[in-house]
Amino acid sequence: MTLTERLREKISQAFYNHGLFCASYPIPIILFTGLCILACCYPLLKLPLPGTGPVEFTTPVKDYSPPPLTSDHKPGEPNEQPEWYVGAPVAYIQQIFVKSSVSPWHKNLLAVDVFRSPLSRAFQLVEEIRNHVLKDSSGTRSLEDVCLQVTDLLPGLRKLRNLLPEHGCLLLSPGNFWQNDRERFHADPDIIRTIHQHEPKTLQTSATLKDLLFGVPGKYSGVSLYTRKRLVSYTITLVFQHYHAKFLGSLRARLMLLHPSPNCSLRAESLVHVHFKEEIGIAELIPLVTTYIILFAYIYFSTRKIDMVKSKWGLALAAVVTVLSSLLMSVGLCTLFGLTPTLNGGEIFPYLVVVIGLENVLVLTKSVVSTPVDLEVKLRIAQGLSSESWSIMKNMATELGIVLIGYFTLVPAIQEFCLFAVVGLVSDFFLQMLFFTTVLSIDIRRMELADLNKRLPPEACLPPAKPVGRPTRFERQPTVRPSMPHTITLQPSSFRNLRLPKRLRVIYFLARTRLAQRLIMAGTVVWIGILVYTDPAGLRTYLAAQVTEQSPLGEGALAPLPVPSGVLPASHPDPAFSIFPPDASKLPENQTLPGEPPEPGGLAEGVHDSPAPEVTWGPEDEELWRKLSFRHWPTLFSYYNITLAKRYVSLLPVIPVTLRLNPREALEGRHPQDGRSAWPPPRPGQGGLWEAGPKGPGTAQAQRDLTLYKVAALGLASGIVLVLLLLCLYRVLCPRNYGQPGAGPGRRRRGELPCDDYGYAPPETEIVPLVLRGHLMDIECLASDGMLLVSCCLAGHVCVWDAQTGDCLTRIPHPGQRRDSGVGSGLETQETWERLSDGGKGGPEEPGDSPPLRHRPRGPPPPALFGDQPDLTCLIDTNFSARPQLPEPAQPEPRYRAGRRAQDSAGYDFSRLVQRVYQEGGMAPVHTPALRPPSPGPTFPLAPEDEAGFPPEKSCPSLAWAPSTDGSIWSLELQGSLIVVGRSSGRLEVWDAIEGTLRCSSEEVSSGITALVFLDRRIVAARLNGSLDFFSLETHTALSPLQFRGAPGRGSSPASPACSSSDRVACHLTHTVPCAHQKPITALKAAAGRLVTGSQDHTLRVFRLEDSCCLFTLQGHSGAITTVYIDQTMVLASGGQDGAICLWDVLTGSRVSHMFAHRGDVTSLTCTTSCVISSGLDDLISIWDRSTGIKLYSIQQDLGCGASLGVISDNLLVTGGQGCVSFWDLNYGDLLQTVYLGKNSEAQPARQILVLDNAAIVCNFGSELSLVYVPSVLEKLD
């Protein structure tokens, strides 16, 4: 078994177990899934509802003025401004973005020093902003003149009264945590606790207090003991009521003068106006809502044609809920992970989820409803999932592989889409496997099995067809037969055999081809390729950033490039566009600002272990406010009872501020308790929470090499994934016989439909079989070795037939019946039995109904039965209590052959009474044999000359129901010319099949023989008490092949060893297993040197045939074992009364698979190289896949014909019916031909079918056997 096959088998088994679990516990699983959906959708409260998201409009900063209150736009003219952009905004928001770091980093600094000193500078900045005054010709303006004045907070916000400003300008900064008091800040021993003490314990959906005061998302602030970059970011938020360009420009120039950012490239060119809606926009919801309505309607109208679905509305609603929940879970999880998707109808993501979810729903529905309806609900769900497991996982792996490759392209747009796709695929898979599968099991469970008439053929379950000229598919032409003898239920092609509606054809086409998902995957690959080809800078930018960040030199050690004058202007006439203020003088290199103290030399040399973190400014810093919650600004204004519904605010360009702090300031600002904290300074060798920089050129080279190794590893991983993906596509798209000549799909189309569009149906023929008559009662045991056929009826008569010609070779009557050894007498007895059996039918048989039997001329007719016997009624005595007790014999005496008088018999001698009655009646006395005691030893040789039977008695040809002390025959086996018989008395007999003589026998024991195995020279007898006896058969002369009459048939095996009448046969007891089972043994098989027993104690045991050593005890059934199969390949199959079938590995004793097969006992079981065929008391024949344990199809038999099956070859199955046999193609489940066995056999069902080696079939019709040869058309087909 290859790796792919093993993986496929593991996946199939896992899905099968999952299906059983979902169908067994539906309510808990649905509740658990509902809780998971609610938990994953809870973060959606952070997002706006569809259509309620903020709307933006951008205008240039230069020459900006608030729009008028009324729009002067004329109707019909194009207008670039939105309708809501009228009048002044509620407020103008100015953010001062601060990035601060301690540089250079001292090795003795603590983790808290990363953010304590940078946060302390926020108080200084707030003072500078409040003290800023603009003096011009129009007068003096301060912050109080232009800012938004607020009053009291809402009454319910008492906890925030000391944190948010009241009765003054709305100005927010991290200093608000300490009431803008620097002394409070320095006295605070735990800054982290102070910041997070107002955070909610649960997941907060609106803007938190930390986000409001810091102005940036929490993960970008850097205020954490676990940060890896020693960089702190926060904003000081100013809210203005009026727009004053000069005041804002002077404030920007002053801050950039005091805290310059030399490498800043932020553009201050535009204002962003953000409008907030109040109600849901119905117009934007229409496309998405329409899509889901169409999905609901399509699934409903499609499932109306599926009879196996109880509630069409419920299933359609469950599909819509599954798809919608998958979408909401995906967006909720993405929000929880930090992504902020939108649910606007214009996004493509919701529609992709709809397409993928719909296709998965159709796949699961089609797979489950295609399972056999006679199975339990949980088995149908398990088989449906198992059959589609490989396809589901294969598509899932392919999609994840494409997403993984797309993510490693490092293009931001592709990476964002890949993150969404991964979350969407996982959530959709989760809901399909748990929610929809469980709902589908509940719906199918509601379909009561009583509502489905299993006896009706499939065409009876269809709605009445419209009158058309041509008959519909699977509608058979009228025949002379009243009804079909079977009903077949195919799993893979059950719906293909019917004329499907077009809507179901579309569903099954989408489910079979998975067209939508493959198109999406192909489109994703093309889109990723186009983006990578057109924007390859994503990878280069990433690599350059990695090398720059880990460079030991940085930008400070690089020599300044000579730049011509005029290329990079140092200032701009407009202060808003100037990098440096007009009055700022250029500082010499490595010189601090005038107000900044010089760095002490003692700390500047040899005390830092990492370079200064590079403070960089990128385009993403211009709009960092976009990463805040959409409820950030509405929440802030709502605290002061100001609503933003149907109004807008204007965000001014960000003012960048860079703060570089030296280690002395960090040490001076440290709290006394920080030194005793549990956070020691990082060591140079540690790579845990901190980024340790290189210490020398060697370390720098190692870091640079490590970056290259990372890139190489990513490339290697992408290459491996791509190769595996191509290999999987090759395995999927190319068949196994790819490239082989003549390996086309034409053979599979042969016989796919039992009745095609042209009205072709499998042929029905009638032949005259060879009828084997000779039994008065029903035949109980059948055995054959290919050339000979042995049958035994309930009366105890054994007949030996020639399997080629159908002639009766020998009859072995019941031991209590007198027997004539002459041939003529045997023929007369045959004719008497024939006359008796024919007379029992109520009338003479019509000529031509059955072929005449070949026989010799018979003698004079015998007298009537019991005519020569006297009336023994007077000898009957019912007073048993008055009878004297006979003493038991002290020792058993040897048994002699029939026909010899027993000497010193211990039983009562009735001969005197019988002789007296004969004399009174005037009849001649007869010889009455006495009972034979059992023989004493395990070895039982009998010479041929001792085989004298009863004396000839032609006047009494048949005593069918004479009493016998030997017991009835319970088991029968045939090999060569020897017949082994096991009787209810526990006696084992070996008979000559040709001569009809008893060759040897064993002693009688108290337990009868329930099963026999006759293999080579070994005989194994299983007894009613659970014991096993191993016998060895020996002859005094060499065994010679038996010369059979007639040419050997096709496929016949070499003749089994036989012995002539002159050989002495001895049967030795070699081994005995006294307690093989606790209860009676019901099944016994042997092959490949192994003996397998099955018992009513629910277990199987595997013995070694040569020494009777028990190898394994197999437990897996919950009922008694009824049938066992084993072949030369060590494959063992067992069936029990629990209706289950187990496949075992005889080499290891492990159970390979367990299948719930029938509603009742499993009556027969056989295997081919690829299939397992079982039958049960429910008159159902099931065909299973041998490797996966999946049910392929089932055949409903006539009442009483459930066990009548046989395998002619690996591709041909024969089943019995009411007077007929049917031939099936095992590969496709197609009915090839039905053969009726004449008029006489129509009234009785075929109870048993035995396939001979010469392509002949023996059918058991009660007291008669029919020998049928396989039709020639099937021989050519096979």
From Swiss-Prot:
Glycans are attached at N263, N590, N641. Its main location: endoplasmic reticulum. It comes from the Eukaryota. There is a cross-link at K454, K466 (Glycyl lysine isopeptide (Lys-Gly) (interchain with G-Cter in ubiquitin)). Ubiquitinated at Lys-454 and Lys-466. RNF145 triggers ubiquitination of SCAP, likely inhibiting SCAP-SREBP complex transport to the Golgi apparatus and the subsequent processing/maturation of SREBF2/SREBP2. It is a multi-pass membrane protein. Residues 731-1278 are annotated as: Interaction with SREBF2. The modification Phosphoserine is found at S821, S837, S850, S905, S935. SUPFAM superfamilies: Multidrug efflux transporter AcrB transmembrane domain, WD40 repeat-like. Residues 1-18, 301-312, 366-401, 445-518, 729-1278 are cytoplasmic. Residues 535-710 are annotated as: Loop-7. The keyword DNA damage does not apply. Keywords: Cholesterol metabolism, Cytoplasmic vesicle, Endoplasmic reticulum, Glycoprotein, Golgi apparatus, Isopeptide bond, Lipid metabolism, Lipid-binding, Membrane, Methylation, Phosphoprotein, Repeat, Steroid metabolism, Sterol metabolism, Transmembrane, Transmembrane helix, Ubl conjugation, WD repeat. Residues 46-284 are annotated as: Loop-1. PROSITE patterns: SSD (PS50156), WD_REPEATS_1 (PS00678), WD_REPEATS_2 (PS50082), WD_REPEATS_REGION (PS50294). The keyword Hydrolase does not apply. One of its GO terms (molecular function) is sterol binding. Residues 60-80, 581-618, 668-696, 834-904 are annotated as: Disordered. Residues 284-442 form the SSD domain. One of its GO terms (biological process) is SREBP signaling pathway. GO terms for cellular component: endoplasmic reticulum membrane; ER to Golgi transport vesicle membrane; Golgi membrane; SREBP-SCAP complex. WD repeats lie at residues 771-811, 951-1001, 1004-1041, 1076-1113, 1116-1154, 1157-1194, 1196-1234. Belongs to the WD repeat SCAP family. Loop-1 binds to loop-7, enabling interaction with COPII-coated vesicles. When levels of cholesterol in the endoplasmic reticulum increase, Loop-1 binds to cholesterol instead, thereby disrupting direct binding between the two loops and preventing the SCAP-SREBP complex from exiting the endoplasmic reticulum. Cholesterol bound to SSD domain of SCAP or oxysterol bound to INSIG (INSIG1 or INSIG2) leads to masking of an ER export signal (also named MELADL motif) on SCAP possibly by moving the signal further away from the ER membrane. This is Sterol regulatory element-binding protein cleavage-activating protein. It comes from Bos taurus (Bovine). The gene is SCAP.
